């Protein structure tokens, strides 16, 4: 399948159409610098990270625990800490919270959480009250802990079966997983779909995001990478690609075979 990249012109942040700049102070938890990829001793543990613009942390309500209390979408905002947009909700009891922006939700729409609410985009309710075939996001794995699955921009899981105390869901990765029917989920798909198909426009945008350039191992010296060295444009000289530390790369399974959650996975991700 051919994926078309949409170039952003101009390259400034003025192209974020339809977002608001309002920032309620009680929902900002402080500043956060981009991670440098270092541990406590200053040693690089994750490569290609560093720099980046300072960020303000928004308090996102993944639990959606205002049961049977309706709220209205006041703003749709850009969040530098995620690809998805967020929207500010004003509840009738005076509470204000940020939630992930569901695709298709508009300013002025009303949302609500609870076990007996209607199946509407943005509403949150337990899986046992949701009909089969519904697209969902912000899925809980543990009841009451808050949504942990399908939270990226454009992500959506599908409810395909319910049996006993468990529901079977198809996750965005293609994984089929059992989740308790008492866990909550939000109806609809996460907004800002297609963000991964947009060209950033210039290299500087990548640096604003805290990502540094990636150098191929083939052009390094042998002391720096297993693929390095040779005369001229030489091949890697190995049966399969290796990581900088000599371990197999590109397809090596890294998940533990005896992980506790294996019993909840009907089919692993593709």
UniProtKB/Swiss-Prot annotation:
MF (Gene Ontology): RNA binding; structural constituent of ribosome; transferase activity
Stored PANTHER family: LARGE RIBOSOMAL SUBUNIT PROTEIN UL2M, RIBOSOMAL PROTEIN L2
Organism: Cuscuta gronovii (Common dodder)
Keyword Ribonucleoprotein found: yes
Disulfide bridge map: none
GO biological process: mitochondrial translation
Keywords linked to the UniProt accession: Plastid, Ribonucleoprotein, Ribosomal protein
Subunit structure: Part of the 50S ribosomal subunit.
Residues covered by region (Disordered): 221-245
Record flagged with keyword Nucleotide-binding: no
Protein name according to UniProt: Large ribosomal subunit protein uL2c
SMART domains noted in UniProt: Ribosomal_L2 (SM01383), Ribosomal_L2_C (SM01382)
InterPro entries to which the protein is assigned, alphabetical: NA-bd_OB-fold, Rib_uL2_dom2, Ribosomal_uL2, Ribosomal_uL2_bac/org-type, Ribosomal_uL2_C, Ribosomal_uL2_dom3, Ribosomal_uL2_RNA-bd_dom, Translation_prot_SH3-like_sf
Gene: rpl2
Family (UniProt): Belongs to the universal ribosomal protein uL2 family.
Domain of life: Eukaryota
Protein's cellular compartments: Plastid
